[in-house]
Amino acid sequence: MTKRLILASQSPRRKELLNLLQIPYSIIASRTEEKLNRNLSPEENVQCLAEQKAGAVLAENPDAVVIGADTMVCIDGECLGKPHDREEAAHMLRRLSGRSHQVITAVSIQTHDRKETFCDTTEVTFWPLSEDDIQLYIETKEPMDKAGAYGIQGKGALLVKKIDGDFYSVVGLPVAKTMRALKEFNIKA
């Protein structure tokens, strides 16, 4: 018997990406508090957050297969979260301007007796951005709910010079790796 699949996320981008697999699922947002542990690497932190999100939803739905995911943007060893205001968004975009950074997405798939967590890292390089470029992009309000203050799937694509890795991982869910991992839980596209 196939278990019910739950996406532990409110992210519209993750929902769109999971829809690509054309498998039935429901959404139950995880209510975990996202706190970084300064003693862990960015990869370890993003994996812990993905595991916490999936685990919290699994605790309330023990007969399900739960997917939790988290994405971080890192530059110079520092992780950039979602900006709190326009000024912080501008500061993040100035840091990313003309440089390469890493986007790390972790996915944790869990059942009551099994857990598989993996991490995917993609390198993204921005074009050099003028102050006008930054302010015009912030005016779109797109940066405000995204790690690193940009969305590669939207107008933020105009900031990107090059990407080395999985585009969908940058958006928030490495679809091909997720599909392969779900097969191990007998959930097939």
Swiss-Prot record:
Its EC number is 3.6.1.9. It comes from the Bacteria. Its cofactor is a divalent metal cation. InterPro entries: ITPase-like_fam (IPR029001), Maf-like (IPR003697). It is an enzyme of class 3 (hydrolase). Signal peptide: none annotated. The keyword Cytoplasm applies. The active site is at residue 70. One of its GO terms (molecular function) is UTP diphosphatase activity. One of its GO terms (cellular component) is cytoplasm. Keywords: Cytoplasm, Hydrolase, Nucleotide metabolism. The record marks 13, 71, 153 as: Important for substrate specificity. Its main location: cytoplasm. One of its GO terms (biological process) is nucleotide metabolic process. It is found in: Cytoplasm. The keyword Cytoplasm applies. It catalyses: dTTP + H2O = dTMP + diphosphate + H(+); UTP + H2O = UMP + diphosphate + H(+). It holds the Pfam family Maf. HAMAP family: Maf. Nucleoside triphosphate pyrophosphatase that hydrolyzes dTTP and UTP. May have a dual role in cell division arrest and in preventing the incorporation of modified nucleotides into cellular nucleic acids. Belongs to the Maf family. YhdE subfamily. PANTHER family: BIFUNCTIONAL DTTP/UTP PYROPHOSPHATASE/METHYLTRANSFERASE PROTEIN-RELATED, BIFUNCTIONAL DTTP_UTP PYROPHOSPHATASE_METHYLTRANSFERASE PROTEIN-RELATED. This is dTTP/UTP pyrophosphatase. The lineage of its organism: Bacteria, Bacillati, Bacillota, Bacilli, Bacillales.
